[in-house]
Amino acid sequence: SHVQEKIAEIIVYLEAMRAFWTRAEEEARENAFGLLVPDRGALDGARNLYPRLYPRLREILEQIGASGLITLPSERDFKGPLAPLLEKYLQGATLEAKERVALFRLAWDMTLSGFGARQELYERFFFGDPVRMYQTLFSVYDKEPYKERIRAYLKRALSVFAEVEA
């Protein structure tokens, strides 16, 4: 279903961030002062990727929640004359109505509330201007090993072509 696909997308992002974390720890090196410093490449990858992932995560929650994020009854509604109907029609396959509404309320707080909007803005810019962060990463990243791999590949490919033509 589309919900499973969207949740799987969230899982992919989670596992990517966990991989950055693991690499940052496992490839940490001691600096000149004897302090353990996390791997720079993993940190740069995470701090450049997450601000772009967060808006997508928020969007996925909005898509999954759909109209359930808009029509949220209050606690007072559950104590009023509509309570039996709310309990009946708002229950989920695995959740009682109040639990389901609480889950939707949490999703609403994370997506549609003022808090959710501020949080997205915060996540987008916490590490700095995203364009400058990418520019900085480009300028400090050691691209030479990858250029060398491409040169070696092209050299091998050209030698194969030369053998075929001979």
PLM region spans:
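Extended amphipathic alpha-helical segments enriched in small hydrophobics
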Residues: 1-29
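Short, charged, amphipathic alpha-helical segments
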Residues: 4-9, 36-44
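Short acidic (Asp/Glu) and glycine-rich catalytic loops that position anionic groups and cofactors
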Residues: 24-35, 83
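Alpha-helix capping/hinge segments and adjacent helical runs
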Residues: 41-165
